[in-house]
Amino acid sequence: MKNEKIVVLYGGDSPEREVSLKSGKAVLDSLISQGYDAVGVDASGKELVAKLLELKPDKCFVALHGEDGENGRVSALLEMLEIKHTSSSMKSSVITMDKMISKEILMHHRMPTPMAKFLTDKLVAEDEISFPVAVKPSSGGSSIATFKVKSIQELKHAYEEASKYGEVMIEQWVTGKEITVAIVNDEVYSSVWIEPQNEFYDYESKYSGKSIYHSPSGLCEQKELEVRQLAKKAYDLLGCSGHARVDFIYDDRGNFYIMEINSSPGMTDNSLSPKSAAAEGVDFDSFVKRIIEQAQ
């Protein structure tokens, strides 16, 4: 309902602050242009509770990325204040923020996902790793401090960099096409195929504007149905709600591997969720409207 007061939460203090500011501005501009009573609130600092109590919004569009928006704290706060919001619940956000926990749940349910474990000083010192592997922070997004590692020397450097962001995981490297699917509750959108600027879809590839996106992805009808079903099952298994995105690798044998679930996807010009929706004929404004009107 357009007479509801909406707060767009963006910014914050995570390493993904700049991306979040861009997402928040795009969403806020869209809502205002559609006639919504919307204001933006930078979640940086310690005044968020006071701001929300002052504004008394009916709904919050969560455009925070990284720990600020995806570790469950904001969801818990909004639920405590009885404010409907566009992201997953506190419990689900905690799970999806931690890639290892998410992976363990998916593997328990026999969902296809690459093998992984925590990377430790002891493991780095061992010489029994089969390269290449992926090394990344267990928590975090935008592929910050994510590396394709091909040797023990590279492993040491990757571990040192990734450990700046918390616990580190080492994951089986899967070669193939990078595919993603956006979901808003029961609406599963078209898959998008990403041709990254670099060897894989790292931070630079995501935000340089030089990667190539195919939306729709060009999968055959059977494979498109399969990847959408896998995306929705993963979304449900991890208890997601609202707007989320599921990322895959599609290998040359026709297998999909779930890489991660993002509970607060980007909404910038280069972001994947709007491209997924656009492939279904849903433009950016309509997509924003669908997300906010389904806030829970």
Curated annotation (Swiss-Prot):
Q: Which GO terms describe its cellular component?
A: cytoplasm
| Cystine residue pairs | none
Q: Which GO biological process categories is it annotated with?
A: cell wall organization; peptidoglycan biosynthetic process; regulation of cell shape
> Which residues of this UniProt protein bind Mg(2+) 2?
260, 262
Please give the pathway this protein is involved in: Cell wall biogenesis; peptidoglycan biosynthesis
> Where in or outside the cell is it found?
Cytoplasm
Record's PROSITE patterns? Answer: ATP_GRASP, DALA_DALA_LIGASE_1, DALA_DALA_LIGASE_2
Keyword set, alphabetical order: ATP-binding, Cell shape, Cell wall biogenesis/degradation, Cytoplasm, Ligase, Magnesium, Manganese, Metal-binding, Nucleotide-binding, Peptidoglycan synthesis
Q: Which residues form the ATP-grasp domain?
A: 103-293
GO-annotated molecular function: ATP binding; D-alanine-D-alanine ligase activity; metal ion binding
Is Cytoplasm found in the keyword set? Answer: yes
Q: Which family does it belong to?
A: Belongs to the D-alanine--D-alanine ligase family.
What is the protein named?
Answer: D-alanine--D-alanine ligase
* Organism whose genome encodes this protein: Francisella tularensis subsp. tularensis (strain SCHU S4 / Schu 4)
**The encoding gene:** ddl
